[in-house]
Amino acid sequence: MREGDSGYFSCYDGNRFRLVILASQRAHELSSGACTAVARKGDKNTVVALREIVGEQLDLAAVFRLAVNRCRKYLEEFTNAREVAAARSSQAAPKSAPGQEIGKSFREKDPSAAAFLDQEQFFSGGGE
């Protein structure tokens, strides 16, 4: 920030992280088609959001609540996706006794296919 710019954000009590959250949420809204409260002047959404915040053109409590709700929704989707993936992998994996191998190597599954090209031939570029 330039020297004279620090006065613009004095209403945030030095909490620049809250400012970033607010500007991010507002920029997201602008990207989704929300109307601007200030003239755009060819600026990108993030700059417009910061100008709206500095100009006190927004209900910051409402913007912050929207940001929190967006984060909650993302976390719920992320958690649900991980739970679904874990459930799928546990259903696909065969149950085995402790200490017992779950799968067999490629050579044990199909010896004829493993003889096609062994490891040394593969790494040397041979095989013919």
Swiss-Prot record:
Ranges for region Disordered: 87-106
GO cellular component, as recorded: DNA-directed RNA polymerase complex
Assigned EC number: 2.7.7.6
Catalyzed reactions per annotation: RNA(n) + a ribonucleoside 5'-triphosphate = RNA(n+1) + diphosphate
One GO-annotated biological process of the protein: DNA-templated transcription
Record keywords: DNA-directed RNA polymerase, Nucleotidyltransferase, Transcription, Transferase
InterPro entries: DNA-dir_RNA_pol_omega, Pol_omega/Rpo6/RPB6, RPB6/omega-like_sf
Enzyme class: transferase
One Gene Ontology molecular-function label: DNA-directed RNA polymerase activity
Superkingdom of the source species: Bacteria
Family: Belongs to the RNA polymerase subunit omega family.
HAMAP family registered for this protein in UniProt: RNApol_bact_RpoZ
Purpose of the protein: Promotes RNA polymerase assembly. Latches the N- and C-terminal regions of the beta' subunit thereby facilitating its interaction with the beta and alpha subunits.
Assembly notes: The RNAP catalytic core consists of 2 alpha, 1 beta, 1 beta' and 1 omega subunit. When a sigma factor is associated with the core the holoenzyme is formed, which can initiate transcription.
Name of the protein in question: DNA-directed RNA polymerase subunit omega
